């Protein structure tokens, strides 16, 4: 079976956590069908902290690190755009997966859309209705460059509808006929995963001998 290659772009630490849920699902259920390439832009990157994040979340370290670091919005976005374009040309993924509303999000959306690679936006449709916020510009622009939009809330669906997105899919998904899906919050998947992990690994009840008699917290 030929694997489809997707390229996931992350930059901020919250994006690592969100991307982990999808990465684990791919590894567990779709490893023969999907190859995931992980790119860290370096927007928020500390070698020690990030290494702990990836280890604790149970996902591999990034295949690429652009090491962009901090700077102005324009400087960071331009550096990411240049680095991502080179990686996309090399890897030629079937799709690029982005999360949220950071500079990494908008840079990846721009890089992919301009060379006609479909963009998959997870956490699409969210709005603060304050365009003075850089994140609001990022999330609006990213949505309008995406082919598949995965929306966590019903309010997000309403926001996209007001911006002209169609909810009835009559054609194959493409950038000028995107498909919108109400999928729920990906952080809930992480909550379920770590709740189960905690139940399996925690020994605090035994260590404190709380299993000897009933107790109340």
Model-derived segments and their meaning:
Residues 20-21, 49, 53, 58-63, ...:
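Solvent-exposed, flexible loop/coil residues
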Residues 44-48, 146-217:
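A nucleotide-sugar donor-handling region in carbohydrate enzymes
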Residues 8, 38-40, 121, 182:
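Structural beta-sheet core signal
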């Amino acid at each position: 079976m030929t694997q489809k290659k997707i390229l996931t772009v992350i930059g901020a630490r919250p994006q690592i956590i969100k991307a982990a849920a999808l990465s684990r699902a791919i590894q567990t259920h779709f490893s023969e069908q999907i190859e995931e390439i992980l790119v860290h832009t370096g927007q928020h990157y500390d070698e020690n902290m990030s290494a702990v994040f990836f280890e604790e979340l149970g996902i591999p370290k990034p295949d690429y690190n652009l090491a962009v670091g901090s700077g102005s919005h324009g400087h960071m976005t331009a550096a990411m755009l240049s680095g991502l374009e080179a990686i996309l040309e090399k890897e030629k993924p079937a799709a690029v997966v982005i999360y949220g509303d950071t500079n990494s999000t908008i840079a990846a959306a721009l890089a992919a859309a301009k060379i006609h690679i479909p963009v998959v936006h997870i956490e699409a449709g969210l709005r603060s209705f304050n365009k003075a916020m850089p994140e609001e510009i990022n999330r609006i622009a990213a949505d309008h460059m995406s082919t598949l939009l995965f929306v966590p809330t019903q309010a997000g669906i309403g926001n996209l509808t007001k911006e002209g997105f169609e909810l009835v899919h009559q054609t194959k998904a493409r950038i000028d006929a995107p498909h919108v899906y109400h999928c729920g919050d990906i952080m809930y998947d992480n909550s379920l995963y770590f709740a189960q992990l905690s139940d399996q690994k925690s020994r605090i009840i035994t260590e404190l001998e709380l299993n000897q008699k009933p107790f109340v917290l």
